[in-house]
Amino acid sequence: MPTTTPSPPPKPSHYTRPLRPMGDAPKGVITRVSGPVVEARGLKGALLYHVAWVGPERLIGEIIRLAGDVATIQVYEDTSGLKVGDEVWDTGAPLWVELGPGLLGGIFDGVQRPLPLLTQPDDQGRPQEPYIARGVILPALDRQQRWPFTPAVNDGDHVEPGDLLGTVPETPHFHHRILVPPDYPPGRVEGLRSGEFRVREVIGHLIPDNGGPRRPLRLSHRWPVRKPRPIRRRLDPNIPLITGQRVIDTLFPIAKGGTAIIPGGFGTGKTVTEQSLAKWADADIVVYIGCGERGNEMTEVLVEFPELKDPRTGGPLMHRTVLIANTSNMPVAAREASIYTGVTIAEYFRDQGLDVALMADSTSRWGEALREVSGRLEEMPGEEGYPAYLASRLAGFYERAGLVETLGQEPRQGSVTIIGAVSPPGGDFSEPMTQNSLRLVGAFWALDVNLARRRHFPAIDWIASFTHYHLDDWFRDHVDALWPELRAQAQRLLQEERELEEIVQLVGSDALGDPEKVILDTGYLLREAFLQQSAFSDDAFCPLEKQFFMLRLVLAYHGAVKQHVRSGRCTFDQCIQESAPIRRSLFRLKEMTLDELRAAFPDLLAQIEHWSQGRH
């Protein structure tokens, strides 16, 4: 009597995902299990990067290699307990994310499962485990919540991919724009109606111009994570992303639509810097990816962000944030999925004409996952064991940033700015992840261990760091005409101070002349009174106008001391003693609010100029 293969156990009703039913799916058998990598034979017709369900618990995996009828699958869940002979199903679809109202304030894992729902009891009232159970499949967006939809087009109107269909007030300060999906053909709108709808309810139809079958329109749609969303054209990034961090905005600014990395060794402040950027950057939406980092760091974000106010709207900071949590104890293969999930969500909001900032902490953990999976695949290793395709994977990620003109008959401008943390072992910037990232990004904010040991934060090394974004014209037009000149002068003084410090370490400061001592003192003032900034005080965010006032006063004081010493009116030590009240005022600048500094600036500048002319 022939034996029949048992079908996989049914999922609870709220753990469903609308993929191909298992009865129609190509089925294979596991022939090899090596950590997160599984080989299966018999998956005829499977395509590269299709999602596969592995084993009796239907673990989520992705086909990453095909050789005949043998498929190699990287599994995004713990593979403990899998055995040779277990069945594998090809779902017939790539790994995709669900995009629509309900994303903001959401907390997802690397494959977009909503983590808060995993703590709720299942259909039988049984509490969930403290860790994610294997094989759990949850819809990313709430299927029960109804969203009020207001159409922006009428029946019979002609629309194209990317056109605005209507809006949904997702938060009190944010109206979610519902667009024609990018993969839909041009056509006419039919039956679009207002009202309250669930994300998967049909709100109307699109009748294609080419006579094809009519397409349903919904509040949400799906998009493959590895496929960049289409755009009309790229634009030159010429508007800075204001971060509120003086060392970044003044010395090494990044443009909206730009890319940057923050490399640094252990304890140099990568995560705090990324969290500060996520809190205070003037982006419309922030996507924060915790890729392989400690769970406590993600907990800090979850605890702090709901309590913080968005400086632009006054609402909770979580109302503009999407969190992707993929901590270090989660399966390593899911780190790659979390990176692609995050950037696809960022592109979705970009298509709505918004400026999005994506924080990836840390891309090095993604690189480690690539190295581990590559080793399991027995591929030829590259430098330090990383796969040979590391550079192309990084390029594919960072190139999804940019300032773009979106699709649609009325194009919008939107941007995705990618800022990735890099954790080189031992702080060695010559390792492959740092070097390959360095070739791809436009700004490099190098964190220095020595600065961190001296408790100088942000510990961004002003000598090793750089930016390729030329934004002087914007700062000249929107802040002050003197901004580029002051920035260049500050960088020159910091460079000269670093060179003099090397001499001081050899012969001591007493061997220097008074002009050199002036440079050393100004470098000290720039470091302590301007560049140093606490992330846990009212000085955590510094507006551009305040940055200009502070830099203008410090450099005006430098000019006054330099003038006295050069003319011989007084020695350097005498100048320091006589100007003690001015110096105390300079060190207190960071404690002042913008309004206070704006009111005090003319008097402080006049005080410095008066002292420079008469010494008293």
Where are these regions (language model features)?
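Short, surface-exposed secondary-structure edge patches
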Residues: A40-G45, Y76-G81, W96, L104, ...
